[in-house]
Amino acid sequence: MDVRAALQCFFSALSGRFTGKKLGLEIYSIQYKMSNSGGSSPFLESPGGSPDVGSTNGQSNRQIQALQFKLNTLQNEYEIEKLQLQKQTNILEKKYKATIDELEKALNDTKYLYESNDKLEQELKSLKERSANSMNDKDKCIEELRTTLQNKDLEMETLRQQYDSKLSKVTNQCDHFKLEAESSHSLLMKYEKEIKRQSVDIKDLQHQVMEKDDELSSVKASKMINSHPNYSTEEFNELTEMNKMIQDQVQYTKELELANMQQANELKKLKQSQDTSTFWKLENEKLQNKLSQLHVLESQYENLQLENIDLKSKLTKWEIYNDSDDDDDNNVNNNDNNNNNKNDNNNDNNNDTSNNNNINNNNRTKNNIRNNPEEIIRDWKLTKKECLILTDMNDKLRLDNNNLKLLNDEMALERNQILDLNKNYENNIVNLKRLNHELEQQKSLSFEECRLLREQLDGLYSAQNNALLEVENSETHASNKNVNEDMNNLIDTYKNKTEDLTNELKKLNDQLLSNSNDVETQRKKRKLTSDQIGLNYSQRLNELQLENVSVSRELSKAQTTIQLLQEKLEKLTKLKEKKIRILQLRDGPFIKDQFIKKNKLLLLEKENADLLNELKKNNPAVETVPISVYDSLNFELKQFEQEVFKSNKRFSRLKQVFNNKSLEFIDVVNSLLGFKLEFQQDSRVKIFSCFKPEKYLIADLNENTLKSNLDADIEGWDDLMNLWVEDRGQLPCFLATITLRLWEQRQAK
């Protein structure tokens, strides 16, 4: 605005100068015309003319020619000056227009920058809101997953607890059955030995009975021969004893037969119990195997379901890709052509759309599974296009940055000019303050001069009054009074004028102070606004520089990714499948697993196809199941049987290891402590000493009791029990004393 006002003033001054020159020339031409118009013409001879008149006419003609020459020269000078001024005005108008255009461009640039800043801020806000919403959704999903995880963990813990409880019950039952089987086996051995011994006795008794029968028959025969024998008392006694012996033997045989029958019944019961124990053992092992494989089977089933879903999704993706690959390429090319044919005025919209396309493309590339070189090529093309868009954006940002730098330089120049004006204004204020101080000093000096003059006047008046009282008369006295009054009036007027001047000085000082305060406030406001504008421009510059750096980094990353993709493409093109050989085990676990999965997948696909065919047939009268279902179930059963076999094998190995370790533990305890431990049912422990293995101690941990058959062998058993167990509560010391006593007894023997 200041430039416009200065130019207008300059043009008005130039127009005034031209109008003045025009008026002078017009007046001069009018005077010349009037001089020529009056009387006869100078070129015609008057009829009654004289030579004087001719000479005067020649002089006048010369003067006229000189004046015409001057007029022509003035007109030429005027036209030259006019042309120069027109050139200057044209140059100034061009400069003025250029400055106005630059100002308008700067204003448009600033408006564009502010608008772009607002748009970017809005985009930032929207992105922040989107990110916040996405984060909230992710947090909600994470919380839901955590809750489900916790629920699953709780279910797993409950199932584990149930499984552990069942396992403990089953193991307890197994141990109980084992102990019963061992006890029944020992009883069987004892009964078998008894039966063998009794059978041998029965055979001996049968032989004796046979011999006695022979003797009886011989006796009867002799009795029949000797119908009237004479028995002696000795023979009679022998016969009676023999009869008693026979009766005793018969009773004994009957008792043995009854005992044999009872033992046979008991043996049958024991066999039945053994059969039941073996059956329960088998059932227990089956249950344990099923329980151990249940979690594994569940996890395998879930994994297979997930794999099936993934494979189905991959199949659908491949089908979609095969169908819509050409359409996507055509759409991408059309979008590129449309983006290239747009005008420069729609740059912001292009940037927004390109940013949205970049985001969508990035999301698409993240979601895609890169398992194919075609997908890699497609991603490479997309990244190449994104790189071109980013380079265009980078160029635009560089231009904006350069414009901002120019604006910043102009603002800095204006700021320096304002600072110079501010310094000049402050210097003027300082000078005015100095003048004010000098005026105040002059005022104080004038007041002191007035005071001194009054004192001198008072002294003069007193001296005059004294002289007048002594010398002069009343008339002279009256005249002196008039003089004194005149002097007093002059002093009062001087005093009033000085007071008026002081008041005016005060007013001027107040005005100056108020003006200085107003100017300072305006200056501060201007300074604040200018500083704020400068800060805003500097902040915006810094932000744009940071954005430029981030964009350049992204560009470098994109270029590196492009290079890597190009290298991968070159490698893929150079590779030949025949030359690739992967060394693997023929019968490795991974290959087995892959083979099983492949077979299972084939069976499931076949089953799915058969079931779909059955559904398409729609025969409600006939209910049939395809053979593929049976094949898949049979395959699963075989897999389960293999896993059960493996788990049984592992369980038997672990059992063997446990038995070996338990025997080692018992041997170590026996060798170190001198006691052999035997764990029984109901938390009982049977302790055998190495110095007397036929004697033992039974410790009941539930009832906290101790029973033994060593009280007869060790003297003062009750005293030792009272001393070490009841009074001191030291069972190891009690056992140590028992070992010492037994060792002493052994050494004594």
Swiss-Prot record:
The keyword Coiled coil applies. Residues 331-370 have a biased composition (Low complexity). GO terms for biological process: activation of mitotic cell cycle spindle assembly checkpoint; attachment of mitotic spindle microtubules to kinetochore; cell division; mitotic DNA integrity checkpoint signaling; mitotic spindle assembly checkpoint signaling; negative regulation of protein import into nucleus during spindle assembly checkpoint; nucleocytoplasmic transport. Keywords: Cell cycle, Cell division, Coiled coil, Mitosis, Nucleus, Phosphoprotein. Becomes hyperphosphorylated when wild-type cells are arrested in mitosis. Phosphorylated by MPS1. Residues 39-59, 323-370 are annotated as: Disordered. The keyword rRNA-binding does not apply. InterPro entries: Mad1. GO terms for cellular component: kinetochore; mitotic spindle; nuclear envelope; nucleus. It comes from the Eukaryota. It is found in: Nucleus. Its main location: nucleus. The modification Phosphothreonine is found at T502. Forms a stable heteromer with MAD2 throughout the cell cycle. Part of complex consisting of MAD1, BUB1 and BUB3 after activation of spindle checkpoint. Belongs to the MAD1 family. Present with 656 molecules/cell in log phase SD medium. This is Spindle assembly checkpoint component MAD1. The gene is MAD1.
